[in-house]
C-alpha cells in the first residue's frame, strides 16, 4: 500500500534545510547504492558522515515520531537515519529494488527494509521530470508531492526516479523496519486504526463499539507484531 504523508515538515523547516544544504558540497550518489542499482543510479547526495546530515536527519526523525498518520501506516519498530539526494542536469535513478537489509551508519546494527520513504524538499514547480515511479500489483504510480510531504511505500516495490529535464529535485530518503512485516497485515491494521479514530470522534472514547474495535486492533497487533 502506498501512503501520502502530508506536512512532515513545515515550509519554514524545508527552507531551513535548503539553506543549510547550500553551504556544503554534495558527493556522488553511488556511494550508498548496491551492486546492481549502482549501474542505474545518477544523482548526488549529502555526505553520510557530515554533521549537517546527522542534524537534519534528527529533525525528520523527531517529526515522524509525533506524526499520527505515519505511525498508523508504518507501525515503525526502527527507522534507518534519513539521507538526502539531489537530481539535476538529466540525472535519474532507473528501475531498481531497495536492498532488503541495510546497516545503520556508524554501527553494526542491521535492519530489515519493510517500507521506503521519500520526503520531498523541492516544490513540484521547481523542476520538470524527476517523478518517483512506483510499480505495484495495481500498476505504475507517478509521485511528485509538495515540499514537506512524504510518500511511504513497500520496499518490495520496483521504483525509479525519472530524468530531470530542468530545475533541481532535492529530497530525503530512508527506510523503516515495521513491527508488522507483512504489507497486507499492515494495511488491515491501518484501516482498522483509522476507523477507530473516526468512531472515537463521532461516538466518544467510551462507546462500546469503539472499545470492541480497539480490543480487536490490539489483539491483531499481538498476533502479528515482531519486536
Curated annotation (Swiss-Prot):
Family matches, as Pfam families: 2OG-FeII_Oxy_3, PKHD_C
Molecular-function GO terms, alphabetical: 2-oxoglutarate-dependent dioxygenase activity; iron ion binding; L-ascorbic acid binding
Residues annotated to bind Fe cation: 96, 98, 159
Binding, 2-oxoglutarate: 169
SMART domains listed in its UniProt record: P4Hc
PROSITE patterns cross-referenced by the UniProt entry: FE2OG_OXY (PS51471)
Note on cofactor: Binds 1 Fe(2+) ion per subunit.
Biological process (GO), any one: DNA damage response
Keywords, sorted A to Z: Dioxygenase, Iron, Metal-binding, Oxidoreductase, Vitamin C
Alphabetical list of PANTHER family matching this protein: PKHD-TYPE HYDROXYLASE YBIX (PTHR41536:SF1)
Name recorded for this polypeptide: PKHD-type hydroxylase ABAYE3291
Species of provenance: Acinetobacter baumannii (strain AYE)
Origin organism lineage: Bacteria, Pseudomonadati, Pseudomonadota, Gammaproteobacteria, Moraxellales
Amino acid at each position: 500500500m502506498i501512503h501520502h504523508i502530508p506536512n512532515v515538515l513545515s515550509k519554514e523547516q524545508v527552507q531551513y534545510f535548503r539553506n543549510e544544504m547550500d553551504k556544503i558540497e554534495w558527493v556522488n550518489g553511488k556511494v550508498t547504492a548496491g551492486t546492481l542499482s549502482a549501474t542505474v543510479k545518477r544523482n548526488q547526495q549529502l555526505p553520510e558522515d557530515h554533521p549537517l546530515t546527522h542534524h537534519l536527519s534528527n529533525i525528520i526523525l523527531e517529526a515522524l515520531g509525533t506524526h499520527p498518520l505515519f505511525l498508523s501506516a508504518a507501525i515503525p519498530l526502527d527507522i534507518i537515519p534519513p539521507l538526502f539526494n539531489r537530481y539535476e542536469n538529466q540525472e535519474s535513478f532507473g528501475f531498481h529494488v531497495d536492498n532488503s537489509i541495510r546497516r545503520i551508519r556508524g554501527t553494526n546494527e542491521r535492519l530489515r527494509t519493510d517500507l521506503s520513504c521519500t520526503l520531498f524538499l523541492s516544490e513540484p514547480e521547481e523542476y520538470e521530470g524527476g517523478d518517483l515511479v512506483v510499480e505495484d500489483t495495481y500498476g505504475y504510480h507517478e509521485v511528485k508531492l509538495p515540499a514537506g510531504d512524504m510518500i511511504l511505500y513497500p520496499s518490495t516495490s520496483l521504483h525509479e526516479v525519472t530524468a530531470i529535464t530542468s530545475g533541481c529535485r532535492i529530497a530525503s530518503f530512508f527506510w523503516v523496519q515495521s513491527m508488522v512485516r507483512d504489507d497486507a497485515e499492515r494495511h488491515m491494521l491501518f484501516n482498522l486504526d483509522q476507523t477507530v479514530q473516526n468512531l472515537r470522534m463521532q461516538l466518544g472514547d467510551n462507546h462500546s463499539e469503539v472499545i470492541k474495535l480497539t480490543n480487536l486492533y490490539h489483539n491483531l497487533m499481538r498476533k502479528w507484531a515482531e519486536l
